[in-house]
Structure formats: C-alpha cells, structure tokens
UniProtKB/Swiss-Prot annotation:
Name of the protein in its database record: ATP-dependent RNA helicase fal1
Extent of motif DEAD box: 174-177
GO CC annotation, single: nucleolar chromatin
Superkingdom of this protein's organism: Eukaryota
Lineage, broadest ranks: Eukaryota, Fungi, Dikarya, Ascomycota, Pezizomycotina
Organism: Aspergillus niger (strain ATCC MYA-4892 / CBS 513.88 / FGSC A1513)
Domain notes: The Q motif is unique to and characteristic of the DEAD box family of RNA helicases and controls ATP binding and hydrolysis.
Length: 399
C-alpha cells in the first residue's frame, strides 16, 4: 500500500480497451528514463496500477489517449509519468500543458509532477486563477517544462504571450467530463486553438459520459481507449447508505444526531450551492460544532489555508460544494455526507471517492428527502449499485 493503490481491487478491474493496448507489468517494461524510474520508486510506487500498465506506454508513443478509471487508481501519475518521459528538460520551454477544473487539483498535479520528476531537474508551474498574476508572468518568462493550470488563467497567459505554446507537444485534460461541460468548453477550445497542430491530446477522468466521449472527436485523432467497464465504477471499500429525512428542514437535526453518534477521523459534507454551504456552516457553529467550509467564491488564499488545515488534520469536518469533489486527495477522510444529493449523477462517484482513499474503509451517507428518491434510484441504476438504508451500527463501520 506504499503507493496508495488498493491492489486487490485493482487486479480485478475489467477494461474496454482498444485492441492495440498491451499490459506492461513493471515500470522497467515501459523503457522509461533512469532518472524518472528513480523518482517513481522514491515516490512509493513498486509496480504500475491497472490503468498505468495500460495507458503509459500508449501515451509515451505519442498516441491521443482516453483513460478512464475510478478515483484512487493512479490516474494522475499515469499522465505525469508520461509527460516526464516525453519532455526534454534541456529545452527550457513549455512542452506539456495539463488543464484541470479546480485550482486545488491543478496545484496537486503540480506537486505530483515535481515529486516524480525529483531527479530530472524539471520545472513545473501551477498557473491558476485567484493568485498573483505577476508571479505567473515571472515563472513563465523564466521557462517551465510543464504547466498545470485552470483554463481561464492559462488562456489569459497564452493571450498575453507569457505562456509560449510553440514547443507544446502534449495537452492533458484532467477530469475531462467537467472540463468539457458547458462552463469550461469554450475556454478549452480557446486554449486548444493556440497549440501546435500536431499536439497530442490525453483525456482523463473517473467518469466519461457518452456525450463527452463524442465531443473528443473534435480535437482527438484516432484515440486509444483505456476504459473501465461502468458497472465497476462504484468504489470498492466504500459502504454507501441513505437516511430518509422526508423534508429538507429535517436534514440539519439528522446531521447533528449523526455527529453525536460517530467518531470521525475526517469528514466532508457536500451541499449543492455556495449559499447552502455558508448557511450550514453558520448553523453548525451556532450549535457548537467545529467545522470549516470551502466553495468557489472564496479568495484563493483562504481556500489554500482551509485546504492546508484540513490536510494536516487541524480541522476535521469540511463543508463544501462540488469544487472539492474532484481529485483532491486527503487520505484520512473516512466519511462523506451528501447533505444534498448531487444534481449531476457523474458527480456522485467523485464525491464518495473522497472517502476510503486508496483501499481504506470509507462510508458515504446520503440524505434523501421524499423528492430525492428518484435521484437516488437513478444513481443506483447508473452505477449498478445498491444503496441501503443506514444501519443502527454505522459507528462500528467507521471505527
């Protein structure tokens, strides 16, 4: 478990892959640079995960690639290792660009690339909104081999000509279903238009609905596909329950009762709107519960410090919108509560994947009003899973 991947679940995964995809059982079989191999082993990996053993070689060959597997299976390292293999660190120009839907995820990817590339003298910059634009300009003018960023700030830096694109050979879209959603789609096309015509495109996500896959035809050429079968997508090791609360106004008392019953290492509570996050945070504090909260309208400095406190365990309960559901890795989270069921069924798996990271036990509890029953059934059907009513002994499951 040093590498943080649940190997038992990983070995059982079934893939729908393109016929040319072969499995590389070890990192040595991938013919990676010696300095990169050192970084991989120092990072804690001993052997590749299922998705890594299939996708890395294809990406390193220069093929456009679509890789889909659930949270905690090593997707970030899949494209990070591939990027580090194909860049030339002697050339101090941007050669790979990774786009993510949230600032926190872009920063996390930067730290993974820096750690894996520890012996390669790699320069990687997180180019994200809400931060000092002067720092971006200084770093980009100095020259960065890899840029990990959010679409808006990256597009801005390209337009201002501080992010030079002529040497870029790979574009990675992480959490691609979110990036190709209405909110980001135009910004992604904006960035894509500035890239050299031969740029390789890698699309990565835990969920890839058919309409998103269809959209990739606009900017991918004959992509290799490494896709986990959908009925394997709900996460092993996470027990999923619902509590029937009937009315919206009963949710708060239910949450307080739960809080009194459970010993929580760390928990994330998801609400659907920023307003609800603020309201619930105030209500919990009035009731003398210690909680922190985060949503997309907060200044970046505040978001960073809340994330740091939560990672270090200084705060135990975080109330958030879906800004936190995507790819953020905090290993101690044992409980996720969907105070509101997600309006988008793809987000369900991203949310519950925050608990039980990397094969640890986790519990997901869904608050379900009488209006929500249909949404819950839709989630069960979509993921071929069963969500049972919460048992009385839920505290034992978290201990």
């Amino acid at each position: 478990m040093a590498d943080g991947i649940d190997r038992r679940a990983d070995d059982r995964m079934e893939f729908n892959t393109s016929k040319e995809v072969t499995v590389a059982p070890t990192f040595e079989d991938m013919h990676l640079k010696e300095s990169l191999l050192r970084g991989i082993y120092a990072y804690g990996y001993e052997s590749p995960s299922a998705v890594q053993s299939r996708a890395i070689v294809q990406i390193c060959k220069g093929r456009d690639t679509i890789a889909q597997a659930q949270s905690g299976t090593g997707k970030t390292a899949t494209f990070s290792i591939s990027i580090l293999q194909v860049i030339d660190t002697v050339v101090r120009e941007s050669q790979a660009l990774v786009l993510s839907p949230t600032r926190e995820l872009a920063t996390q990817i930067q730290s993974v690339i820096m750690a894996l590339g520890d012996y390669m003298n790699v320069q990687c910059h997180a180019c994200i909104g809400g931060t000092n634009i002067g720092e971006d300009i200084r770093k980009l003018d100095y020259g960065q081999h890899v840029v990990s960023g959010t679409p808006g700030r990256v597009a801005d830096m390209i337009r201002r000509r501080h992010l030079r694109t002529r040497h870029i050979k790979m574009l990675v879209l992480d959490e691609a279903d979110e990036l190709l959603n209405r909110g980001f789609r135009e910004q992604i096309y904006d960035v894509y238009r500035y890239l050299p015509p031969a740029t390789q495109v890698v699309v990565v996500s835990a969920t890839l609905p058919y309409d998103v896959l269809d959209m990739t035809t606009k900017f991918m050429t004959d992509p290799v596909r490494v896709l986990v079968k959908r009925d394997e997508l709900t996460l092993e090791g996470i027990k999923q329950y619902f509590i029937a609360v009937e009315k919206e106004e009963w949710k708060f008392d239910t949450l307080c009762d739960l809080y009194d019953t459970l010993t929580i290492t760390q928990a994330v509570i998801f609400c659907n709107t920023r307003r609800k996050v603020d309201w619930l945070t105030d209500k919990m504090r009035e009731a003398n519960f210690t909680v922190s909260s985060m949503h997309g309208e907060m200044p970046q400095k505040e978001r960073d410090s809340i994330m740091q406190d939560f990672r270090q365990g200084n705060s135990r309960v975080l109330i958030s919108t879906d800004v936190w559901a995507r790819g953020i890795d905090v290993q101690q989270v044992s409980l996720v509560i969907n105070y509101d069921l997600p309006t988008n069924r793809e987000n369900y798996i991203h949310r519950i994947g925050r608990s039980g990271r990397f094969g640890r036990k986790g519990v997901a509890i869904n608050f379900v009003t009488s209006d929500d029953v249909r949404i819950l059934r839709d989630i069960e059907l979509y993921y071929s899973t069963q969500i049972d009513e919460m048992p009385m002994n839920v505290a034992d499951l978290l201990s």
